[in-house]
Design a protein with these regions (language model features):
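Hydrophobic alpha-helical transmembrane bundles of multi-pass membrane proteins
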Residues: 21-22, 115, 146
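Membrane-interfacial loop-to-helix junctions in multi-pass transporters
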Residues: 25-33, 113-119, 158
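Single transmembrane alpha-helix segments in multi-pass membrane proteins
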Residues: 1-24, 37, 41, 45-63
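Membrane-helix/interface signature in polytopic inner-membrane proteins
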Residues: 127-166
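Hydrophobic alpha-helical transmembrane segments
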Residues: 8-12, 34-42, 64, 115-122, ...
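Residue-level recognition of pore/gate-forming positions within transmembrane alpha-helices
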Residues: 14-18, 44, 70-74, 125, ...
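Transmembrane helix-bundle core of multi-pass membrane transporters
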Residues: 62, 66-134, 161
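Juxtamembrane membrane-interface segments at transmembrane alpha-helix termini
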Residues: 19-27, 51, 74-83
Length: 170
């Protein structure tokens, strides 16, 4: 499975997380940040499920569908920041309101923009590395990708693996 649409999944995750941050902008609770992160993850996952569905149901080419969906996600974002999410005090620039501090990741080094997202990214790389190189599921992903006939003969569930790969990439 080739997922060329990771940018679209990232964009839809940002839209879902950003929408949550804007919706909860007046809330002063430590639960806002986890809600924003969770909705961001769900946004990317749901966007990744669309090409998975099209691939498994209609045998659509996942390269084309995921790539085209990246453009759709970009257009949705453009619509939102030029329309309903535009900051009325933003001097007509296409941007949303500033998120509250409760919706922002903590800064790691004062005077920089380095935040906790760096740690999340490094942890994600480690988890995906372990998943792909040290687990049965990672082996199944490789076999389905490199030798679909062998995967079928071994009894690997191709449909399940396509769905999982697109969901994880979201």
């Amino acid at each position: 499975v080739w997922n060329i649409g990771a940018e679209g999944q990232f964009t839809m995750g940002a839209i879902a997380g950003g929408g949550t941050a804007l919706f909860l902008n007046t809330q002063e609770s430590f639960l806002v940040l986890p809600a924003v992160l969770l909705m961001g993850i769900l946004g990317g996952v749901v966007w990744g499920m669309i090409p998975a569905f099209l691939k498994t149901k209609f045998n659509a080419n996942e390269i084309l569908t995921s790539l085209m969906l990246s453009y759709v996600a970009l257009l949705i974002l453009s619509y939102l920041v030029h329309g309903p999410w535009r900051d009325p005090g933003g001097y007509n620039f296409p941007e949303s309101e500033i998120f509250s501090d409760f919706a922002m990741l903590p800064i790691l080094l004062e005077g920089t923009r380095l935040n906790l997202g760096t740690g999340f990214a490094l942890l994600s790389v480690l988890i995906i590395y372990i998943l792909l190189s040290r687990t049965v599921l990672g082996y199944q992903f490789k076999v389905v990708g490199l030798a679909p006939a062998a995967a079928k003969h071994a009894g690997f569930d191709r449909v399940k693996l396509i769905w999982l790969s697109m969901i994880i990439s979201g």
